[in-house]
């Protein structure tokens, strides 16, 4: 009964790609910034080979890694969550999704206001924590929705949970998702609920993503069609618009995501458990919080022995990322165009350096290979 546990450490890039300058990300390195250029607090990741990966030049790594490891190259034209996860799952995007550096067109907003019955505030790129400081009071007074974007292909809606109930906010997001198609088909519509009063507001964990559907079948669809279990943990369900999953569960942050992963390790299933740990990106990368990022990575490292102990003889653990978000890159709080790591551990898997791969899609191809399923997706198995 083969099982694959694929964990995405959301935003853990390991160094700028050659074309990073085209994205404004030259010199970024999330792993180096988050660790302070030291592997001292990550003994389990070090032992597995994270710091032996091509291009990770600030650590000597370990002499005898316990896992197989590789540097992954993003072939798609993008650096966001949707594009990154799609490519991991075997879909390469030749064109970037639309972005709105000057805000959304009036035609989109008018239709959104008509269908939701609410006005709109902001409509420009903004930091998620700053936008509720700037517009929170006016939103509470008027009930108008705070609509904003970023350097990524996102339409974000912030609303106070006591002004706009969560289910209404989620319905407003579904309305926006239906409007934002074709030329305005953004990667994600994101619900950003918050609480607080009088200019002192904080975002809650009740975020939801409403993603564009993948343009073709991913490894999830292939596995489901083959009769395998396909389990999504965290925002995996939202990223893939629910497609290809047989079961899913949301999480309230990294600790909850790790707990749910441990729970699935104890369960009998045959197929894939696909986990996204979002705190690295949402709480620390975007906020330039180096210390927070480092602590979160340490917490994950400390959880690895229990994860590995619970693995069965034919289980495969894969650890990767979907893009970068360098907390030390003060020119921006946006995602960064970086290589990502792949660390693979199995009791029957030979450790060693798998070099630099041409696409994230090799991960999806490897998952299919490990589960003895054939499918028409991009990428080549590393096994």
Residue ranges of predicted features:
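Feature captures the catalytic ectodomains and active-site-proximal regions of enzymes
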Residues: 1-383
